[in-house]
Amino acid sequence: MKMGRRLLLRLTLGGCVLCPALATADPLQLGLPVACDLGRTCFIQSYVDIDPGPAVQDFACGSATYDNHDGTDFRLLSARDAATGVAVLATAAGTVKGVRDGMPDRFANAESRSLVANRECGNGVVIDHGGGWETQYCHMQSGSVKATVGQKVDKGTVLGAVGYSGLAEFAHLHLTVRHNGKAIDPFTGAERNASCQRDPSANPGLWDETVRPAHRYANGEIIAAGFTSALPDLKQAEVDGGIAPPTATSAQVVFFARMINLKAGDVVMLNVEGPGGFAAQSASKPLERNKATWIAYAGKRLKQSAWSPGTYAGTARVVRNGATVVEVSRSWTLSE
């Protein structure tokens, strides 16, 4: 009698012991949880923190995480991008175990932290994959959640859209993978207290063959760069990208670069050249501590009636221990 009740409970929660596709203790093979181009329209802001103490360490022995972070954050460039409806996808087949919707999208501040206490995940979905495996999807856009409790989903099923509900400082999806109730790092398939990997490509982790080629580990990344007529601001950039394209009579022309996961000691260098003798440079002092997000810019104010027509070119570099670890170039052309 007790055995029958346990079986019924497992079936009710979606862990069907008679369904071999779900009832397996083998590691999951996860697809990308966001319908985006990884490294171009979305980026990994934070990995799982595998350090058991107050220090931080990601799976690749880097610092692209924060203390006690139990998931992976896939970020968009701005809330404006999230407003277009970037889909959140089931990473593997399973049964929806829980959902929440209706929490507003708003960036976290001192006031909102208390409003989301015990609901920091915001709008989200939990999927039971059987064999003790489950995935949780957080910070989804208010009103976007399509999944329902008990629903069977396939890998790639649309669950809703990326947002910034709950405790979120930027538009992103937080994905947590668990096995038997314990958080698992999807980049290694191991629990959070495992050793880091000096070669992040040595272990495919839980990702399937569609994700592995797209992922390139980076502890320091330039996620956006270009020309603008306004001095960039990090908070505004999270709202709408912070870009106001320059014109022939803009009061200033500025080249900027937005970066994530910089390390203490990094130096950010910008160089801009253009027609009419246009030239501007900037070099930061070595950063005193790690920076989850950072913005740098260089430019000039207009001192004549209009900017000279032609192509303006800017280059941004992150220099670490004397070597360039990432570099991007962008241009802006002003027609005659």
Which sequence ranges carry the predicted segments?
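Acidic, glycine-rich catalytic/binding loops that coordinate metals and/or anionic ligands
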Residues: 26-55, 115-117, 146-151, 176-256, ...
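Zn2+-dependent peptidoglycan hydrolase active-site motif and core
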Residues: 83-85, 91-142, 177
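Short, well-structured beta-strand-loop connectors
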Residues: 87-98, 146-161
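Solvent-exposed serine/threonine-rich low-complexity stretches and specific carbohydrate-binding patches
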Residues: 280-290
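Aromatic sugar-binding surface patches on proteins
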Residues: 289-302
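A short tyrosine-centered beta-strand micro-motif
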Residues: 310-319
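Short beta-strand elements
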Residues: 323-336
